């Protein structure tokens, strides 16, 4: 029986992107690979994962997708029921054919996949779309091995966590928010803390990172699970080659505006500040105005992604002069990989979601980190302290937001005085591309995983032959 891997991402832009790229990479290694998407995404956006195949299942929201759910909790509840049934039906339909699945790789938040896989007798491997460091914190906190420090000691002095398994000491504010408390999304916090609770030392867990970037944390994780970094799962030119003209994951759930690239073409090399806070976060009107005024004060041309739902947060007329003169461009969504690859971009103001952080590192773009919640505070800490590839904005304690002066300071620190961070970002770009190039650290880890799935398929074949249940048309 030939190996056939079923890849199951969470149906959101930030989770789909790396797993689509992973499916492509796995299929390029000669392993039959099928990526699962939802009926809604298949109908409205489409997914190109070639040479991997794509199948659609129900998530219980076939007409409107995630946006049609009343809440995150309601979406996940319906998705668990509908997707479990739909995925099981897909597996069963393939079981008696030469295309039966021999392994499942699933987003580590999609924990409903595990009982489906067990009932089908198929090994299931979690794929983390977060950094190794954030994943480690969630695992160690969830298992009671690492304590989050209190807000303040009795004398008012802050305390730090102890170093543990490759993790450095951290302030409470640097922890991923779900490790501190559930906040407004208790169901997501619960999923975060138990992502790898079932994994033992010999169980595979795949990470969208690369060994050179997080070597100490990865070494620590290997004491608890078979952790392997197989990223960055980003469409990248390999080391020593130029960029490609069109860079895309192949799963655009939003609609990027091509005007971005034409506008960037008119700007000098390294002159533009690119601003985007991802596909989920909403800043609010006051924070949006502070960022806008900070950008204007810094004086660099800027390209800012403001989603349609957030356009009303921008004060009326504030950026009219800048946009009319060509000093600023506001778009609802951008082709981010192409923007980061453009020579005009000199820095990236980012919320430090993991995809955005890893993309910036992989394209050598220094960052201004304005983290908001979940994994972002820890990513921002590492951008500044562990990787020296950017500066971290400090939130004003009284105002509870990033003020315009701090935004201006950070942009100037990177754009005007950022030789060191540009050099560090360039180093990480080179190492990221080397990691996924033939023989690189991530490429070797992916080869190791390919050996695992092929060996498992061979063992399943032997068992089926011994039981006299060889499927028609199967191949060794």
Question: Predicted segment positions?
Answer:
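Glycosyltransferase specificity loop/lid
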Residues: 1-476
């Amino acid at each position: 029986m030939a190996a056939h891997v079923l890849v199951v991402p969470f149906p959101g832009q930030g989770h789909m992107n790396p797993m689509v790229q992973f499916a492509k990479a796995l299929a390029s290694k000669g392993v039959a690979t099928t990526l699962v998407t939802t009926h809604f995404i298949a109908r409205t956006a489409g997914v190109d994962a070639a040479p991997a195949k794509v199948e659609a299942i129900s998530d219980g929201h076939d007409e409107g997708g995630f946006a049609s759910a009343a809440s995150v909790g309601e979406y996940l509840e319906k998705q668990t029921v509908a997707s479990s049934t739909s995925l099981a039906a897909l597996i069963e339909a393939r079981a008696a054919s030469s295309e039966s699945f021999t392994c499942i790789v699933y987003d580590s938040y999609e924990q409903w996949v595990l009982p489906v896989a067990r009932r089908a007798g198929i090994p299931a491997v979690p794929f983390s779309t977060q950094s190794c460091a954030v994943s480690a914190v969630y695992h160690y906190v969830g298992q009671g091995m690492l304590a989050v420090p209190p807000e303040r000691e009795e004398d008012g002095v802050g305390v730090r966590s102890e170093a543990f398994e490759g993790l450095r000491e951290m302030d409470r504010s640097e922890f991923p928010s779900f490790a501190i408390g559930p906040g407004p999304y208790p169901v997501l916090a619960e999923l975060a803390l138990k992502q790898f609770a079932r994994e033992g030392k010999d169980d595979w867990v795949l990470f969208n990172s690369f060994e050179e970037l997080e070597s100490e944390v990865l070494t620590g994780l290997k004491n608890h699970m078979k952790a392997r970094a197989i990223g960055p799962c980003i469409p990248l030119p390999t080391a020593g080659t130029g960029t490609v003209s069109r860079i895309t994951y192949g799963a655009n759930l939003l609609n990027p505006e091509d005007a971005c690239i034409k506008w960037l073409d008119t700007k000098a090399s390294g002159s533009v500040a690119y601003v985007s806070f991802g596909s989920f976060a909403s800043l609010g009107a006051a924070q949006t105005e502070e960022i806008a005024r900070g950008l204007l004060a810094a004086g660099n041309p800027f390209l800012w992604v403001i989603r349609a739902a957030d356009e009303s947060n921008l004060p009326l007329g504030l950026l009219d002069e800048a946009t009319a003169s060509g000093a600023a461009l506001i778009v609802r969504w951008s082709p981010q990989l192409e923007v980061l690859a453009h020579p005009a971009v000199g820095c990236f103001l980012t919320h430090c979601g993991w995809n955005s952080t890893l993309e910036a590192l992989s394209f050598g773009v220094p960052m201004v980190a304005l983290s908001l919640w979940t994994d972002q505070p820890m990513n921002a800490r590492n951008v500044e302290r562990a990787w020296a590839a950017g500066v971290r904005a400090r939130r004003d304690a009284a105002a509870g937001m990033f003020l315009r002066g701090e935004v201006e300071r950070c942009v100037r620190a990177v754009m005007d005085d950022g030789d060191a961070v540009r050099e560090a970002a360039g180093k990480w770009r080179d190492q990221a591309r080397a990691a996924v190039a033939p023989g690189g650290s991530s490429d070797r880890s992916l080869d190791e995983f390919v050996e695992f799935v092929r060996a498992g398929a061979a063992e399943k074949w032997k068992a089926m032959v011994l039981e006299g249940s060889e499927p028609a048309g199967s191949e060794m």
